[in-house]
């Protein structure tokens, strides 16, 4: 299945574990009742109407439940949404619009979003870790890897 190519083996194993924990009767499918129970376990109480709406969005075969491939599709859609948000964040941080984050742009962002503010040494360590190609700047791909690794 093509969607599986989006994820590493480690991610797929994590998703499989998550799927199995939601599939409480072990039949290889998550029912609306199991999905509702999963949300309740993290103290989110959704109406049956909302659960049915969510199931309808992922239940591509009309079976009224979610198999692992549909579960992976849901994860891929969540992943895609996160990638869009991260790309927008990168563009916002790239103040000179040159397609990369300079150490100063990253320092400004990191200092503004941490409390207490990060030290120069801490920020330099992050830049060093993220700058895979050694050009002294953080491109979008390096930024994505940095965020996903944290």
From Swiss-Prot:
GO molecular function terms listed in the Swiss-Prot or TrEMBL record: calcium ion binding
Purpose: Calcium-binding protein involved in larval development and metamorphosis. Likely to function as calcium buffers mediating the transport of calcium from the sea water to the blastocoel where calcium is required for skeleton formation.
Lineage, highest ranks first: Eukaryota, Metazoa, Echinodermata, Eleutherozoa, Echinozoa
Organism: Strongylocentrotus purpuratus
Database matches in InterPro entries: CALM/Myosin/TropC-like, EF-hand-dom_pair, EF_Hand_1_Ca_BS, EF_hand_dom
Domain of life, source organism: Eukaryota
Positions annotated to bind Ca(2+) 3: 94, 96, 98, 100, 105
Family annotation (Pfam families): EF-hand_7
Limits of the EF-hand domain: 10-45, 46-79, 81-116, 118-150
Binding site for Ca(2+) 2: 59, 61, 63, 65, 70
Classification via PANTHER family: CALMODULIN LIKE 3 (PTHR23048:SF0), MYOSIN LIGHT CHAIN 1, 3 (PTHR23048)
CDD domains named among the record's database cross-references: EFh
Coiled-coil annotated residue ranges, if any: none
Entry comment describing in which tissues the protein is expressed: Found in cell lineages giving rise to the aboral ectoderm, a squamous epithelium covering the surface of the late stage embryo and larva.
Residues annotated to bind Ca(2+) 1: 23, 25, 27, 29, 34
Residues that hold Ca(2+) 4 according to the record: 131, 133, 135, 137, 142
Protein name: Calcium-binding protein SPEC 2A
Keywords carried by this UniProt record: Calcium, Metal-binding, Repeat
């Amino acid at each position: 299945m093509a969607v599986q190519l989006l994820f590493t083996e480690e991610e797929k194993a994590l998703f499989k574990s998550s799927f199995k924990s939601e599939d409480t009767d072990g039949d290889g499918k998550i029912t609306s009742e199991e999905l509702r129970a999963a949300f309740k376990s993290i103290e989110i109480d959704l109406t049956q109407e909302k659960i049915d709406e969510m199931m309808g969005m992922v239940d591509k075969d009309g079976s009224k439940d979610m198999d692992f491939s549909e579960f992976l599709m849901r994860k891929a859609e969540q992943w895609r949404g996160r990638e869009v948000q991260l790309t927008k964040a990168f563009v916002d941080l790239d103040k000179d619009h040159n397609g990369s984050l300079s150490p100063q742009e990253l320092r400004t962002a990191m200092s503004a979003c941490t409390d207490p503010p990060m030290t120069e040494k801490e920020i330099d360590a992050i830049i060093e870790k993220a700058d895979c190609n050694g050009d002294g700047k953080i491109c979008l791909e390096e930024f994505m890897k940095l965020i996903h690794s944290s």
